[in-house]
C-alpha cells in the first residue's frame, strides 16, 4: 500500500523533498567557501531535479515529462563554434557533423547554437544601425544650428531701413505731381546724371560765348519752353512771336537783359546759382519760376520734357505746355536739316545772321554789333 501524508503527498516524496532541501543548503554553504563555484548551473540542476520529484509525486512515474538539461558549453567548444561562425553563418549538414565530432556535442545542439548565434548577430547589427542613425541626426541638427547662426547676422543687417528713403521723401515736391517719383528707381540716377551733365556743359560753351559777344545779343527763345534749339533755321518762324507774351512776364525780363553782352554774363552767373540751388533742393535739373533760365545761351540738351512732370507750380506748367505746343513743330522740322548742335560747320556769320533775324522777329531794330 502507498502511504499518503499531508495534502495527498506520499511519505516517500516528503522524504525526498527534505533530502533535496538539505542538499541545496549544503550547496549554498559550499558556494560561500568556494569562490570558483558557479551557482547558476548547479541551481538549475537542483531546480530540475526538484521539479522532477514533484511531478513524480503528483502524477506518478508513468506520466513524468521528459526534460532535457541545459547544455553547458566549454571554452574550447565555444571557440570552435565561433571560428566556424566567422567563416559562415549557415553551415551545411556535413560541416555541422564534423563540428559536432570535434566538439563532442550532438549535431542538434550545434544547429541550435548557430540559430541562436545568428539571432544575436542580427540584434547587434540593428543596435549598431540605430546608433549610426542617431549620430547622423545629431550631426544634422548641429549643422543646421551652425548654419542658422551664420545666416542670422545678414538678416539683422538688412533690418534697419535705408536713410535714402527718408531723404527722398523729404525732397519730393509739395504740390500734386503728374508723375510718380521712385527714389530707388533708375530715374533718380538719370536725373542726377543729367544735372551733372548740365553743370559740366557750363564750361563747354565758353568759346561760343565769345563768338556770341562779337555777334551781338544771343538767340533769345522762350525761356519757359521745355525743348529748344538755338541753331535751328526755323527759329525766325512768325509763329514764335504770339507765344512769347504767354510766359507770364518772363520774356519781358529776358528782353531787358538782351540789350548788351554784359547782361549775358549776369544771366550766366544767375543761371549757375539757380542750378546749384535747384540741385540741392530737388534731385532733377527742373525749371523754377524765381529766375529765368539761361539755357538758350548754353546750347545744352534739346529735349528737356522729362523733368516737367515734377514742376512744383501748376500754372507755370500750363504755360510751359502752351509754349511746347508752339515750339514742337518747327523744332522737329528743323532738327532733320542740322547734323548736330556742337558741329564745327557753324560760323560767326551764320550766328550773326540768325541773331539779326531773331532780333527782327522780336521787334528790336537797333542791335550793337
UniProtKB/Swiss-Prot annotation:
Any one of the GO CC terms: nucleus
Biased composition (Low complexity): 222-233
Positions occupied by motif OAR: 346-359
Subcellular location: Nucleus
Biased composition (Polar residues): 181-191, 244-253
Keyword presence, Protease: no
Protein's GO biological process: midbrain development; regulation of cell cycle; regulation of mitotic cell cycle; regulation of neural retina development; regulation of neurogenesis; regulation of transcription by RNA polymerase II; retina development in camera-type eye
Tissues expressing the protein: In embryos, expressed in mesencephalon with strongest expression ventrally. In adult, expressed in midbrain.
Main location: nucleus
Residue span of region Disordered: 124-253
Annotated Basic and acidic residues bias: 128-152, 204-214
Pfam family, one: Homeodomain
Keyword Cell cycle carried by entry: no
Keyword annotations from UniProtKB, A to Z: Developmental protein, DNA-binding, Homeobox, Nucleus
UniProt feature, compositional bias: Acidic residues: 194-203
UniProt GO MF annotations: DNA-binding transcription factor activity, RNA polymerase II-specific; RNA polymerase II transcription regulatory region sequence-specific DNA binding
DNA-binding region: 66-125
InterPro entries: DMBX_homeobox, HD, Homeobox_CS, Homeodomain-like_sf, OAR_dom
Superkingdom, taxonomy of origin: Eukaryota
Protein family per UniProt: Belongs to the paired homeobox family.
Name used for this protein in its record: Diencephalon/mesencephalon homeobox protein 1-B
Naturally occurring in which organism (per UniProt): Danio rerio (Zebrafish)
Gene that produces this protein: dmbx1b
